[in-house]
A protein has these predicted regions:
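Small-residue hinge/turn detector
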Residues: 136-148
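Glycosyltransferase-associated regions of secretory-pathway enzymes
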Residues: 1-135, 153-328
Length: 328
């Protein structure tokens, strides 16, 4: 009987020790080893670092306020009211990116706060600010924080972007394209580039200065000039004098013909043949997307079906349709 009592007591003591070890040692192990791993995973998951581990090509798209046709835009995985030109340009851009090394991230009013929680203005077609100013401000924020290549909506990409992305990673800190709209004969002037397409490393001083000036302009002016972004980028370039900086002139952006005359948007929407200065050099054709969307004389083009777009046979529809055909 005595030995039985001792055995029971041993079992009780063993149980108490096991209980202590389970709830204290395991708790210690959890707090020091397991919990930090879970928190780190949650942090990384919420940040979605997997989306920006590679170099990023950024672009933006939104529903125009006038548009009433529905098209399925696979890149955004939802129905969006996007004119066929912008839909096609997005598909073409996607096809020119080597996904092994680079990602395409399409910013929209629905996801902008995920990437830029501190973005200071409403980013949709109902905003009081012009689309051009809003997109320029967006580019300055994205490139300052993440770096990469920002391609404005409605840009036709004619060559793969491997070389540009490689040079941006290993050779240059800043890459610009084309000439400023406001400055005549600026095609070869790297101090006055266009700002429809910009490549930069994150935290680049020139882009940080550009962003700062854009914000100052936003806060100090009741009305924001839609072309002010180009001016402010130029001021920042002149002020910072970037060393590792490369500029592609207008031969690469479809802005000029062989006589060095600017190719107008009306010419692209017309039927008279285009005489590019050097067609083999073309990388992008960047269009003033805000004019295409909101100038009444181009309104007919925004309501074309895919079939009507191809059959329109204008210069712009021929160029875009050819690139789409190469994808499909």
């Amino acid at each position: 009987m005595k030995s039985s009592s001792i055995l029971i007591l041993v079992f009780i003591i063993f149980g108490l020790i096991s209980y202590y070890l389970y709830y204290n040692v395991f708790d210690l192990l959890y707090n020091h080893k397991i919990h930090p791993l879970i928190e780190d995973y949650k942090k990384n998951f919420n940040r979605k670092n997997r989306s920006i581990e590679k170099q990023v090509v950024w672009t933006y798209i939104e529903d125009p306020i006038f548009f009433d046709q529905d098209y399925y835009l696979q890149l955004l995985e939802k129905k969006k009211n996007v004119p066929i030109l912008f839909n096609f340009c997005l598909q073409i851009l996607n096809s020119k990116i080597n996904k092994e090394f680079n990602d395409l991230i399409v910013i929209s009013p629905n996801n902008i706060k995920h990437y830029l929680p501190d973005f200071p203005i409403e980013m949709n077609a109902q905003s009081k600010y012009s689309q051009k100013f809003r997109v320029d401000l967006l580019a300055s924020f994205l490139l300052s924080k993440y770096g990469g290549l920002f391609v404005s909506p409605g840009t036709v990409v004619l060559k793969d972007l491997d070389e540009i992305m490689y040079n941006l990673k290993f050779k240059y800190d800043l890459i610009t394209f084309g000439g400023s709209i406001r400055n005549v004969n600026s095609c070869n002037d790297k101090n006055h580039p266009g700002n429809y397409i910009i490549g930069a490393k994150h935290s680049n001083p020139t882009i940080l200065g550009y962003k700062k000036r854009m914000l100052e302009n936003l806060h100090n002016n009741g009305y924001v000039d839609k072309l002010v972004g180009e001016d402010l980028l130029s001021y920042s370039i002149i002020e910072n004098k970037p060393d590792k900086y490369f500029h592609f002139n207008c031969e690469y952006t479809g802005n000029v013909d062989y006589r060095n005359h600017v190719i107008s948007l009306d010419h692209y929407f017309g039927y008279r043949p285009l005489d590019f200065k050097n067609e083999e050099n073309l990388i992008f054709i960047s269009f003033p997307y805000d004019l295409i969307l909101y100038d009444k004389k181009y309104g007919w083009f925004n309501n074309l079906s895919e079939k009507q777009f191809v059959e329109a046979d204008t210069n712009i529809s021929i160029i875009v349709s050819k690139e789409i055909y190469n994808i499909k």
